[in-house]
Amino acid sequence: MSAATDEILEKLKSLTLLEASELVKQIEEAFGVSAAAPSGGMMMMAPGAAAPGAAAAEPEEEKTEFDVILEEVPGDKKIAILKVVRGITGLGLKEAKDMVESTPKPIKEGTGKEDAEDIKKKLEEAGAKVSVK
């Protein structure tokens, strides 16, 4: 903002309610505008704003994309988990090994619910701790 607009803003902040009301009247007269709300019988709302109580009535949108996160890999289960990770991701041995050794690490991102649950099940069967977010 410029110094002039900053100065005006500071002066507006210091006005009393009566002074602000007088200012509105003067602006309406000087510029030929009206500060009155549109008379449509209904208030306009900003996009995304909800009427009070409406949020409770509307069901929350169901999440459609999930991330499967490899949280923990027990040392004795590392090879089995590595095989599952390679099968899921299609990564080479070195890349999959790096992924398994650097937990927590996302294994699959933006996948569907069923696919995410299937991946989680496979990894847990191999001995890994997995979360779906």
Swiss-Prot record:
InterPro entries recorded: Ribosomal_bL12, Ribosomal_bL12_C, Ribosomal_bL12_C/ClpS-like, Ribosomal_bL12_oligo, Ribosomal_bL12_oligo_N_sf
Key word Ligase present: no
Keywords: Ribonucleoprotein, Ribosomal protein
Molecular functions per Gene Ontology: mRNA binding; structural constituent of ribosome
GO cellular component, one term: cytosolic large ribosomal subunit
Keyword Ribonucleoprotein: yes
Signal peptide region: none
Domain of life: Bacteria
One of the GO biological process terms: translation
Subunit structure of this chain's protein: Homodimer. Part of the ribosomal stalk of the 50S ribosomal subunit. Forms a multimeric L10(L12)X complex, where L10 forms an elongated spine to which 2 to 4 L12 dimers bind in a sequential fashion. Binds GTP-bound translation factors.
Protein name: Large ribosomal subunit protein bL12
UniProt source species: Crocosphaera subtropica (strain ATCC 51142 / BH68)
